[in-house]
Amino acid sequence: MDDNLSGEEEDYYYSSDQESLNGIDNDESVSIPVSSRSNTVKVITKESLLAAQREDLRRVMELLSVKEHHARTLLIHYRWDVEKLFAVLVEKGKDSLFSGAGVTLLENQSCDSSVSGSSSMMSCDICVEDVPGYQLTRMDCGHSFCNNCWTGHFTVKINEGQSKRIICMAHKCNAICDEDVVRALVSKSQPDLAEKFDRFLLESYIEDNKMVKWCPSTPHCGNAIRVEDDELCEVECSCGLQFCFSCSSQAHSPCSCVMWELWRKKCFDESETVNWITVHTKPCPKCHKPVEKNGGCNLVTCLCRQSFCWLCGEATGRDHTWARISGHSCGRFQEDKEKQMERAKRDLKRYMHYHNRYKAHIDSSKLEAKLSNNISKKVSISEKRELQLKDFSWATNGLHRLFRSRRVLSYSYPFAFYMFGDELFKDEMSSEEREIKQNLFEDQQQQLEANVEKLSKFLEEPFDQFADDKVMQIRIQVINLSVAVDTLCENMYECIENDLLGSLQLGIHNITPYRSNGIERASDFYSSQNSKEAVGQSSDCGWTSRLDQALESGKSEDTSCSSGKRARIDESYRNSQTTLLDLNLPAEAIERK
């Protein structure tokens, strides 16, 4: 124990050990609270889905002075991107905005969609029958048809899954039908279909919105997640599931989404099984089934009773001596087969190298998850002892830092497998450049791995049984290592983003930025709305005055909003307490089966 705690023998990767000790007497120096700024990730439940949708509808309705179904049509067309909708309005004008989305507004339009309140007979251009005027319905585009034809048209479109954009029946008319009219006509004959129509419109806020996605939990929790800033992020739903918002897979940074999808398939499909069969077996020349040699003799007999030479794979007779095999002599060296076999062996060995280390850290994470209860017990016992040290938050902070850094370390191996292999970037880097980058990355990875293991070791120490001096030494080591692994994780991400992926021509391999506080937990949408109303801040980000000027002048305006995304409202978190780091275990450790 004393050897492990010797400061002279430990060589931690940190720019200045003394700097990390300056605040030792104050545990706030290592307590890493969740950021006090407004939460940028919201969880939308079934109850708050309608409120979330109405928030965007209200903004468009107020700024454009249009009905709700017109605002919905515009938002669906622009995938519920309010800022993009406003930008098109400023750049191209109101007419272009409406025509592109299929919205038609008639001057002096009556609120009543019926053609006439009288019983005078009028002809329907679809069924070519004369019906009373009150049985004809006119849409915003001015086209009118009988209610039976409209109802049949709406029924077909809803059943075909086109509820979000039901266009007028008139020839070459692309106007979107009024959802109130659709609902009113369909509900008279098929109330269930009307409910289906409303459900499609409601879920459009999630299905068509790139900033909102369903939680991929199984069984489904019923929640959706909305992000305010960048869709390239990792989030945690209120149900506890952590996932990548970009691809809806488990959180996998520093792997890109493409890398993780390839790795996941490689681990679960039969690709490596095929490699093993290629390396360790040979096909029978008669039945073509793979045969594994279980002895030293090169004359092999398949279950189908066919004998063949193990060296070249050619069929032979069954008799042989030490000098020759009956009916066979090996031919010339076949270079292609040998190269193929050697390549398969090399690829299998390389895959097993990265997979074994990835799996080892995943297994370590599962074992370290049990440390949470042990740490709590040791802290509880230590607080009851008469020790000089009264605050043991350093142990909890160190445990959370261990979980976070172990997750990063686990997924760094799949990243390295594809980054320095031939599958993705063979033509992007020369062999010399690949070697330099690989050495740079592996140095970072090795330093992180060494410090993570040291941190894990010190947290497992029974400090609840030690005297004051040893507890203080463990505390210093845990604090130093917590700072060190956080710095190393940040450096690794910077290395990946700038030195590795940043120099490549392909821009599809983006990674989620490193968050020292861990994966962001989604806050409730209702609470954020209440906070917004309490603060009384506008979420229009300056668009209102600019749009008024654009609509009045009718000219395009080259301006930009101070926020490229939805505006955020700062919250004080007055009723919340300062919390510690997120308990970010690898997804395998928290995956619901």
Curated annotation (Swiss-Prot):
Tissue expr: Ubiquitous.
PANTHER family named among the record's database cross-references: RBR FAMILY RING FINGER AND IBR DOMAIN-CONTAINING (PTHR11685)
The protein's role, per its UniProt record: Might act as an E3 ubiquitin-protein ligase, or as part of E3 complex, which accepts ubiquitin from specific E2 ubiquitin-conjugating enzymes and then transfers it to substrates.
Annotated positions binding Zn(2+) 4: 244, 247, 252, 257
Chain positions recorded as Zn(2+) 2 binding sites: 141, 143, 168, 173
Catalytic activity: [E2 ubiquitin-conjugating enzyme]-S-ubiquitinyl-L-cysteine + [acceptor protein]-L-lysine = [E2 ubiquitin-conjugating enzyme]-L-cysteine + [acceptor protein]-N(6)-ubiquitinyl-L-lysine
Region TRIAD supradomain: start-end pairs: 120-334
UniProt enzyme class: transferase
Lineage: Eukaryota, Viridiplantae, Streptophyta, Embryophyta, Tracheophyta
UniProt cross-references to SMART domains, sorted A to Z: IBR (SM00647)
UniProt: Zn(2+) 1 binding residues: 124, 127, 146, 149
Organism: Arabidopsis thaliana (Mouse-ear cress)
Cytoplasm in keyword set: no
Zinc fingers, IBR-type class: 195-257
EC number: 2.3.2.31
Residues involved in Zn(2+) 3 binding: 215, 221, 237, 239
A Pfam family reported for this protein in Swiss-Prot or TrEMBL: UBA_ARI1
Protein name: Probable E3 ubiquitin-protein ligase ARI2
Cofactor(s) named in the record: Zn(2+)
Binding site for Zn(2+) 5: 284, 287, 302, 304
